[in-house]
């Protein structure tokens, strides 16, 4: 019986190591990022900025994100996108003290009522659409800049997701606030199980 538990434990470790770095668009764990701008931090009542602010905002959103982690993993596999990046984008789209609520035909921001959190934060089709738009932007960057690295494609795709397809004109445009904040949140979420 103990050999069975040992085998199951080894399989779980192998699965963990395989899923800890996947996605077709760069390795977020190896990316350096300055995190959220001070404007983002101040906008959400924080008196600090950078990675610390991004991590705090992701931490606030984590209880809601965890409910949708299996959905993000499924969608991540479909689009070959790291679920931590998907979670980082969703966290950025629902900053700090606000949460996204599925209102049927639209998504609305509402104040977090604490223990009375909504049962439906965001739908699978909305998460899928968000991920599809991001991967489309990344592929546009790949076509426009074929010599860039996968990490540059991810950064470029995140900046283009936020600023539009024409936002990225050179490698100097890869440090937009949206990208820096999302990557810092994604790295934090990755360390916490995404």
From Swiss-Prot:
Family recorded in the similarity comment: Belongs to the glycosyl hydrolase 23 family.
Keyword terms, alphabetized: Disulfide bond, Glycosidase, Hydrolase, Secreted, Signal
InterPro entries the UniProt entry points to: Glyco_hydro_23, Lysozyme-like_dom_sf
Statement: the UniProt record of this protein carries the keyword Nucleotide-binding: no
Annotated protein name in UniProt: Lysozyme g-like protein 1
One Gene Ontology CC term in the entry: extracellular region
Disulfide cysteine pairs (residue numbers): 24-80, 38-49
Protein EC: 3.2.1.-
Organism, scientific name: Homo sapiens (Human)
Intracellular or extracellular location(s): Secreted
GO molecular function: lysozyme activity
GO biological process: defense response to Gram-positive bacterium; peptidoglycan catabolic process
Signal peptide feature range: 1-19
